[in-house]
Every structure is written in C-alpha cells, then in structure tokens.
Amino acid sequence: MPVKNIVLVHGAWADGSNWLKVIPKLEALGFHVTAVQNTLTSLADDVATTRRAIALEDGPVLLVGHSYGGVVITEAGDDSKVSGLVYVAAFAP
C-alpha cells in the first residue's frame, strides 16, 4: 500500500508552525500531512504525542523529523504503521 500520510515532527525551540511552508506543497502532491505539536517537556511526552498522531492516520505513515525531531521519530518509528523515517538536519541513531 502506498504511503499517503506524512507526519512532520519539529525540532527543539520550535513548534509545528515551522512546517507551514512545506505542508501545502506536500498536500498539493496528494499527501495527507499532519504537523505534530510537541510540548518539549520530555522525550517520552513528545514520543507519546507523535504516536497519537500516527494512530489517527488511516494507513501507512512516513515520519519526518527535523533536528531534535529526529530523536522523536526514531523512538516512535517502531509503530507498525510507519513505513519510513526521514531525517532533516536531524539527530539520527
């Protein structure tokens, strides 16, 4: 099944609005895009928030993480719905 859902995870000292210029471009290509709004209170909290976003998607998900978001997608990436991880200037395993 092709991936049609993309979940974007922002880095530290940022929020989901950092993806505002990217989201319409991906949507124009036919993707359903969600920008996670992490609290940045702890890694565990941010992973839980990202996992909730994954659970709301109706099929395979591509996770995209910027900066600290790379750590978050690495932890959340073990979900069976996740088809791949994209690291954008991110901390990778």
Please describe what each predicted stretch is.
Residues K4-I6, H10-A12, K25-E27, V33, ...:
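Serine-dependent carboxylesterase/thioesterase catalytic core
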Residues A12-K21:
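The serine-hydrolase catalytic nucleophile loop
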